[in-house]
Amino acid sequence: LKCKKLIPLFSKTCPEGKNLCYKMTMRLAPKVPVKRGCIDVCPKSSFLVKYECCDTDRCN
């Protein structure tokens, strides 16, 4: 699985066990990603932060 890094032109091959791509954004600025990469379990979104996870690089 390859996921995009914070700089969209670059991607990263995920290590074994981390089989989800994720994108973290602030709710106040939803179009600006704060963090991107590979993750094993999708964190819960909170009042300030929104997480978007999927098993392809389409969401991040």
From Swiss-Prot:
Pfam families: Toxin_cobra-type. Keywords: Cardiotoxin, Cytolysis, Disulfide bond, Membrane, Secreted, Target cell membrane, Target membrane, Toxin. GO terms for biological process: killing of cells of another organism. It is found in: Secreted; Target cell membrane. Disulfide bonds join C3-C21, C14-C38, C42-C53, C54-C59. The keyword Transport does not apply. Expressed by the venom gland. One of its GO terms (cellular component) is other organism cell membrane. GO terms for molecular function: toxin activity. Shows cytolytic activity on many different cells by forming pore in lipid membranes. In vivo, increases heart rate or kills the animal by cardiac arrest. In addition, it binds to heparin with high affinity, interacts with Kv channel-interacting protein 1 (KCNIP1) in a calcium-independent manner, and binds to integrin alpha-V/beta-3 (ITGAV/ITGB3) with moderate affinity. Monomer in solution; Homodimer and oligomer in the presence of negatively charged lipids forming a pore with a size ranging between 20 and 30 Angstroms. This is Cytotoxin 5. It comes from Naja mossambica (Mozambique spitting cobra).
